[in-house]
């Protein structure tokens, strides 16, 4: 059992590498092809759209072939696509590759969470927050390695090839995973509409992912232009969010076993609201950084709890409920920053963060769904 747990942690770590390198490639592509912000926004939409579009199909693939095989296939394809992204010769080719990469990463995300859910069920203990902590550690580690490599004169293509090599090395342990996760679909049943509980889980996940997208894209802008911090210092807002998210996930399973999953969910949503209130209502850059860190610590365990609950929805097969919840969450990450931008353009960025806080408040009342 320990071997399966550690290998599950490894594949979550690998997924963290995949999403971070994707994010790091983007600004270099913007510079290489002289893309404006509007054009870049449309290009980025391709990745998120691909991810959301493929998730229902990914659930069926997991049910048919097992998450272990799906992880192997999608991780191998990711290793091929990463160097291709770094070497894309034109914006059009990059957009097409990003759509494929987003679709493949969406399928990988469904597969690793399905594997996490079945390993958790086999162990009889909560592990999903710990798995997602490994994902967060993968993002932090790859960001640090990328920063060092690029600072020493490495190219984006070299970074992509190196990252693909690390993922390939991790795949050598894939045989230790559970071969079959998820129940096989009844004959002819390839799609099912989400039931009420799945929709509640999905909407809570939307709020959690919207928060992540908002802090990723807008925290530095808020601290720079609303709080007057220097541009390099303004990035501390997202750094605090990311580090505290990882810290929350490292302790989340023990808290959930001690206090209960709904209690941890409510505490997380409440801390997220408090963090946004602190950042918006106190006119201080340092306090803003603390506020975004509090948001990360509060919301860090929401997605793991929701994904774990999605695998246990009564009356709905896991290969239907899990992709539905993950897809709705991804929609929050994709559309949330856009919504923040639209509200900000009319009412200010502080008010826009208030919208996010309201959604977290609604998630507070949906916490019973994770029991």
Regions picked out by a protein language model, each given a short descriptive name:
Residues 54-67, 150, 248-260, 344:
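Helix-to-loop junctions at the C-terminal end of transmembrane segments
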Residues 130-178:
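Helix-loop-helix hairpin linking two adjacent transmembrane segments in secondary transporters
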Residues 53-92:
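Conserved MFS/SLC helix-loop-helix module at the cytosolic interface between two early adjacent transmembrane helices
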Residues 34, 66, 87-92, 228, ...:
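Helix-breaking motifs and short loop linkers at transmembrane-helix boundaries and internal kinks
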Residues 69-83, 263-278:
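Structural signature of the two symmetry-related core transmembrane helices
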Residues 157-174, 351-369:
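Symmetry-related core transmembrane helices of the 12-TM Major Facilitator Superfamily/SLC fold
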Residues 106-122, 301-314:
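Intracellular juxtamembrane helix-capping segments at the cytosolic ends
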Residues 24-38, 217-233:
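Short amphipathic helix-loop junctions that connect adjacent transmembrane helices
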């Amino acid at each position: 059992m320990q071997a399966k747990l550690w290998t599950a942690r490894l594949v979550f770590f690998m997924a963290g590498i995949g999403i971070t390198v994707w994010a790091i490639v983007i600004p270099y592509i913007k510079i290489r092809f002289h893309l404006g912000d509007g054009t870049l926004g449309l290009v980025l939409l391709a990745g998120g759209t691909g991810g959301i579009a493929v998730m229902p199909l990914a659930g069926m693939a997991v049910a048919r072939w097992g998450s272990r095989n799906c992880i192997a296939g999608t991780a191998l394809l990711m290793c091929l696509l990463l160097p291709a992204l770094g070497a894309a010769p034109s914006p059009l080719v990059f957009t097409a590759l990003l759509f494929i990469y987003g679709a493949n990463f969406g399928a990988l995300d469904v597969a690793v969470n399905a594997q996490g859910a079945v390993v958790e069920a086999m162990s009889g203990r909560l592990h999903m927050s710990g798995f997602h902590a490994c994902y967060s550690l993968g993002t932090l580690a790859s960001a640090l390695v990328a920063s060092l490599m690029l600072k020493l004169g490495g190219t984006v293509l070299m970074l992509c090839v190196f990252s693909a090599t690390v993922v390939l090395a991790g795949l050598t342990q894939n045989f230790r995973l559970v071969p079959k996760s998820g129940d096989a679909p009844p004959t002819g049943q390839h799609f099912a509409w989400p039931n009420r509980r799945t929709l509640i889980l999905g909407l809570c996940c939307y709020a959690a992912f919207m928060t992540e997208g908002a802090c990723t894209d807008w925290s530095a802008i808020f601290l720079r232009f609303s709080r007057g911090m220097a541009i390099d210092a303004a990035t501390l807002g997202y750094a605090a969010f990311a580090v505290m998210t990882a810290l929350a996930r490292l302790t989340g399973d023990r808290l959930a076993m001690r206090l209960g999953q709904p209690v941890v969910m409510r505490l997380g949503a409440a801390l997220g609201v408090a963090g946004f209130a602190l950042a918006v209502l106190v006119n201080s850059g340092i306090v803003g950084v603390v506020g975004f860190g509090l948001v990360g610590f509060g919301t860090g365990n929401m997605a793991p709890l929701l994904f774990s609950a999605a695998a246990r929805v009564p009356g709905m097969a896991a290969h239907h409920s899990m992709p539905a919840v993950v897809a709705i969450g991804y929609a929050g990450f994709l559309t949330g920053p856009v919504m923040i931008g639209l509200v900000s353009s009319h009412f200010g960025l502080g008010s826009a963060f208030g919208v996010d806080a309201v959604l977290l408040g609604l998630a507070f009342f949906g916490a019973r769904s994770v029991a």
